[in-house]
Swiss-Prot record:
Organism of derivation: Paxillus involutus
Protein name: Atromentin synthetase invA1
EC number, UniProt record: 2.3.1.-
InterPro entries named in the record: AB_hydrolase_fold (IPR029058), ACP-like_sf (IPR036736), AMP-bd_C_sf (IPR045851), AMP-binding_CS (IPR020845), AMP-dep_synth/lig_dom (IPR000873), ANL_N_sf (IPR042099), ATP-dep_AMP-bd_enzyme (IPR050237), PKS_thioesterase (IPR020802)
Stored Pfam families: AMP-binding (PF00501), PP-binding (PF00550), Thioesterase (PF00975)
UniProt GO BP: biosynthetic process
Cited function: An L-tyrosine:2-oxoglutarate aminotransferase (probably invD) and atromentin synthetase invA1 catalyze consecutive steps to turn over L-tyrosine into atromentin, which represents the generic precursor molecule for the entire terphenylquinone and pulvinic acid family of pigments, which are widely distributed secondary metabolites in homobasidiomycetes. The first step catalyzed by the aminotransferase converts L-tyrosine in to 4-hydroxyphenylpyruvate (4-HPP).
Family the entry assigns: Belongs to the ATP-dependent AMP-binding enzyme family.
Modified residues (O-(pantetheine 4'-phosphoryl)serine): S635
Temperature dependence: Optimum temperature is 25 degrees Celsius.
Length: 959
């Protein structure tokens, strides 16, 4: 066996040779800077298009711009940027959501002579976000941000930032009309072009410097590898802040004159079928799909025979994949499924090309275009292949970083070539440690090269990858170490992928503080493992595959006092930890057995199977006593349970409220039996909806917003599992035969009595969202009048004086507000449609909203026009109750949480509208800024940050 040889020879003429290949089918004009790329594309292919589908749930249409129009717009935008009066070469942090906005901002910065730095989505955890922004500010020595209104709000609490809005810049750009080749300054190939931030999985982010030369070297080679031409059509849904989204799927195709369609990730992830529809509709040739999407598409579509033969997929020639390993059987199943879905399977011929790349290498630099339909993969995961032109790879001894490994032996993967980054910005130490002699970049990955083809076998770096996103293991371990039952410094989390598993997971190894053979070991182990799982889900959205307790005297540390993840994982794979795993399973079975009840009736068994399907459990592991929300159920899962239950039991409807009230298998089964056999009479109204019941701390009572419903709280309630019960209060009128409330006093009396029935005595913690805030305030007053202690009254984005606002809202306004809250219409539509709709009948107005509503959202909410009409009446009844509301009296203390208001500035909202709450509190009133806007502060993106802030205020009040 011979030492691993370099695969591609890098010479000073590599870019020239690529340019020669490029020019053979194009023109003698060869771009050498990014400026040239844009000019060339606009001049040579003026009518070719950039297409965009935004993140809006209300508009999935494709918006297009020709290369010529885009070129003109971004040059005017660049000219407007000059008015910032920044020195040439200044760094502008670009923090935007949509592809079109990001693309325009990056090109404008470049053309204005600035250096854009693309900022990924900021953390929802306030401390982490503030630490990152402060780090970026110090790293660049400046703090100029170009963002949108939502982005500005996210960083508004951080001092010292110079924030500019893209919307204002666009308005300023309308005053300019520069030439089609305008630039503010001349640049050279080795000048800084774009900065990309690393994931920060092992600490604060580093800023990767890519020059015009490194980007063009990568893009020339990528285009050659993909077979791009000016007739190609590209589909991208990777975020523009990622090198794959901006360089691989935008600049590389632009260099070759290829048309592009950029889709916000949410549009694909919420409806994977859209991926195939777009391939068909736009004759896509090259697209990107990570392993988890390949697997999801296959699972969702392989059994949908009604869709077979529905799509024209003959255009697609290549699907790139990256971010995580591609499972060979998944790739084969995906290809087979696409052939079944195609109108003409014989014309479906494409490669799935897994690749290796990093931010430092301009994304993919090693590819394996595999036709899995004609050749059998050699391994469980598809190999990653060979380098693109200009790139070299080698495998070396990770200890010294230079000694080559022989063919077939694993070691550290290193790459070099003109597409490798030049340096980390303002971080000479990290740059130096990333390279070894000869310009080889140390990737931190462990690989094997056989016959010139590379595959990965592990990572040196301390991360775990979940759906292509890297999470830092040390940070996760820090939080896991805090769990009661874990011996301090004797816990390690290690990445792990089980044989046949589609995505990577991880294992937690730890030494328990208690004796595994002690009298109460089962209950202690159960509590410890439940807490470890809860923290893992909250931190990285994934529970551990295995949790292995090992007696402390059997957990060996290195001479430096550290646990070796590699050693522990090796012992696990070799079966050396089997006795500890068996003991843990025995104890957990004992603990679970104490409360486990085998589903007995056919209804219970059917529900157990539905629960198992939703949570990926074995049916035999679902107890009749299992609670839907304690298993991890979300608001989306509630809708799925509702749909599957209605289908399984042949019921026209299972009311959502009944699922919320009966989340336990046996309880829901009893309700369904009653519904099927004799129908369920309208039961006595009870506003209390128990969203989760575990934990010993003071319960939370959360009052509904102005729409009356409480599903908005389901995701928030999950964060209080094993800490404190979480009850929501739902308005009256949703169920048949229930009258609406007719006054605020009637509502408050009902809610206060319900709270007392649920928790007989204080101290109480009660809060309300929006309209529910004033109701919560009144309930707190009522409880105090009964002689009870209310230690926490939380008011979420609502002022004390609401009567004037209630009088402003007519039926049309209320209907549009509700429709926006439910995600049926956009905020702009809700604001703009009212004047033209008011002269119409109620039915006509509802028809307009119905036509604007995304069909998938209507299905998700199980809405009909009649149900929407009734819901508007419920919301209207609450508005009527608030029209005469005049706050008075006081409570012991108030905690006010404020977000971006529906109208006006946040500063005015706080100082003029919310500060008057001080008149109604006998103690100090706190005012806490929370992420998001009025209608989004508890959505999936913002609830992780909100719950942390909300919990901190509970703790501050001694709860």
């Amino acid at each position: 066996m011979s030492p691993v040889a370099t695969t591609t020879s890098v010479t000073p003429d590599v870019i020239s040779s690529l340019k020669t290949s490029f020019s053979a089918g194009q023109t003698s004009y060869i771009p050498s800077t990014l400026f040239d790329v844009l000019s060339y594309a606009a001049e040579r292919y003026p009518s070719h298009e950039l297409g965009f589908i935004t993140s809006s749930a209300h508009d999935s249409s494709i918006q297009t711009k020709t290369f010529s129009l885009f070129n003109a717009q971004v040059r005017n935008l660049g000219r407007a940027l000059l008015d910032l009066n920044k020195p040439a070469g200044s760094i502008i942090v670009v923090y935007l959501t949509e592809h079109e906005d990001n693309m325009a901002a990056v090109w404008a910065c470049l053309l204005a002579g600035y250096v854009p730095c693309l900022q990924p989505a900021l953390s929802a955890q306030q401390a982490h976000k503030e630490g990152h922004v402060a780090h970026i500010k110090n790293l660049f020595g400046s703090a100029t941000w170009l963002t949108n209104e939502a982005g500005a709000e996210q960083v508004s609490s951080i001092a010292g930032l110079e924030i500019h809005l893209l919307s204002e810049l666009k308005i300023a750009a309308e005053g300019y009309s520069v030439s089609a080749d305008w630039t503010a300054r001349t640049v050279q190939p080795d000048d800084e072009a774009i900065l990309f931030l690393t994931s920060g999985s092992t600490g604060f982010s580093k800023a990767v410097v890519h020059t015009h030369r490194t980007i063009l070297a990568a893009c020339y080679a990528k285009g050659e590898a993909y077979g791009l031409t000016s007739e190609s059509n590209i589909l991208n849904w990777v975020g523009f802040d990622h090198v794959a989204g901006s360089l691989e799927m935008h600049i590389a195709p632009l260099l070759y004159g290829a048309s592009q369609l950029h889709v916000h990730a949410s549009a694909i992830l919420s409806d994977p079928l859209r991926f195939l529809q777009l391939i068909d509709e736009k004759s896509i040739n090259v697209a990107f799909a990570p392993n988890f999407l390949l697997a999801k598409l296959t699972r969702d579509l392989e059994k949908k025979t009604e869709l077979f033969g529905s799509f024209d997929l003959s255009s697609v020639t290549r699907i790139n994949s990256g971010g995580e390993a591609v499972v060979s059987k998944t790739a084969k199943a995906f290809v087979a499924t696409l052939k079944n879905l195609s109108r003409d399977p014989s014309k479906v011929s494409f490669v799935i090309s897994p690749g290796f790349g990093m931010t430092e290498t301009c994304a993919g630099c090693i590819y394996n275009p595999a036709d899995v339909s004609t050749s059998e993969p050699n391994y469980e995961f598809l190999e990653l292949g060979t380098p693109i032109t200009g790139c070299e790879m080698r495998i070396v001894n990770p200890e010294d970083g230079v000694t080559p490994r022989v063919d077939g032996e694993s070691g550290e993967l290193q790459v070099r070539g003109p597409m490798v980054f030049s340096r980390y910005y303002n971080n000479a130490e990290a740059t130096a440690s990333s390279f070894v002699e000869g310009g080889w970049y140390r990737t931190g990955d462990v690989g094997i090269v056989e016959n010139g083809v590379m595959r990965l076998s592990g990572r040196i770096k301390e991360t775990v990858i979940v759906h292509g996103v890297s999470y830092g293991i040390p940070e996760l371990e820090t939080y896991l170490q805090t769990v009661e039952g874990v011996t301090h410094s004797f816990l390690a989390a290690a990445p792990y992928r089980a044989p046949g598993q589609e995505t990577e997971g991880f294992i937690i190894f730890y030494a328990p503080t208690f004796d595994l053979y002690g009298e109460d070991a089962s209950s202690k182990l159960f509590a410890t493992h439940r807490a470890l799982r809860d923290i893992s889900v909250k931190m990285i959205t994934l529970p551990p595959q295995h949790i292995v307790p090992i007696p402390v005297n059997q957990m060996e540390k290195t001479t430096l006092g550290k646990l070796s993840r590699a050693r522990l994982t090796g012992l696990f794979k070799q079966g050396e930890l089997a006795k500890h795993i068996a003991r843990a399973e025995e104890l957990l079975s004992e603990a679970r057995g104490a409360s486990f009840v085998t589903p007995q009736t056919e209804t219970e068994q059917t529900l157990a199977a539905i629960y198992a399907g939703i949570f990926n459990l074995e049916v035999a592991d679902v107890s009749a006593t299992d609670n839907f929300f304690e298993l991890g159920g979300t608001s989306i899962d509630v809708i799925r349970l509702k749909r599957e239950g209605e289908a399984a039991f042949d019921l026209p409807e299972i009311p959502t409220i009944q699922i919320l009230k009966h989340p336990v298998v046996s309880s829901l089964a009893n309700y369904i039996v009653a519904l099927k056999t004799k129908g369920v009479n309208a039961e006595e109204y009870d506003p209390i909806v128990p969203l989760q019941l575990t934990g010993k701390k003071t319960p939370i009572f959360m009052v509904h917003p102005g729409v009356g419903e409480v599903l908005i709280f389901v995701n928030l309630a999950k964060y209080f599992q094993n800490e404190r019960p979480f009850y929501a209060l739902r308005a009256r009128g949703f169920e048949p035969g229930q009258p609406f409330f007719t006054s605020m006093d009637e509502m408050v009396s009902c809610y206060a009595a319900a709270v007392k029935r649920t928790q007989a005595h204080g101290p109480y913690a009660i809060a309300g969202y929006s309209y529910g805030g004033v109701v919560a305030f009144e309930v707190a007053k009522r409880l105090e009048a009964m002689g009870e202690e209310v230690k926490f009254t939380g008011l979420i984005n609502i002022p004390p004086h609401i009567a004037d606002r209630m009088h402003e809202i007519d039926w049309t306004g209320g209907m549009l507000n509700l429709s926006y809250f439910l995600g049926l219409v956009s905020k702009q539509d809700a604001n703009d449609l009212a004047p033209s709709m008011r002269p119409l009948t109620r039915k006509e107005q509802l028809e307009i909203v119905w036509k604007l509503s995304p069909p998938e959202r209507l299905v998700e909410l199980q809405l009909t026009p009649e149900k929407l009409d009734h819901w508007v009446d419920i919301a209207g009844s609450l508005i009527e109750c608030g029209k005469e509301y005049n706050p008075g009296g006081s409570v012991s203390a108030l905690d006010v949480f404020y977000a971006i208001p529906l109208r006006g500035s946040k500063e005015d909202w706080l100082n003029k509208q919310l500060k008057p709450w001080e008149e109604f509190s006998r103690g100090a009133t706190s005012y806490t800024d929370v992420p998001g806007q009025h209608y989004t502060l508890m959505d999936f993106d913002h609830v992780p940050g909100f719950q942390k802030i909300f919990r901190s205020r509970l703790e501050a009040r001694g709860l």
